[in-house]
Amino acid sequence: MTTYQILLKDFNRNNTNVGYFIKIADNNYTFFCRWNRYCDCAFLTIEDSDRKAVISSIALVNGLRIRHNKIPYVINFKQIYGETYEPTIDNIAKEFAFFYDIEDET
């Protein structure tokens, strides 16, 4: 099994709205992350290659599992070292990531 990691680089106090173009199993997606100061957390929207929302405005909390029939794998959002604290605007880009596993062909 191979684990893939998608880091949230460039997401910080000066850049609170970011988009990442990601290819998963020959499908193109755009992950939009937006920090909400009122809630003090990030929200995620995922669009497919046709710019249709697959996932819309879910809070990025540690341990989040994203499962959808338009995404071929379960995507987990978590702290990269397995810690249990929640992301902040100061640590989200350095310490949190999306992860998904693909079975290796034998």
List the predicted regions and their residue ranges:
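C-terminal low-complexity, charged extensions that often adopt amphipathic alpha-helices
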Residues: F77-T106
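Residues that cap or initiate secondary-structure elements
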Residues: N12, N28, R37-C39, D50, ...
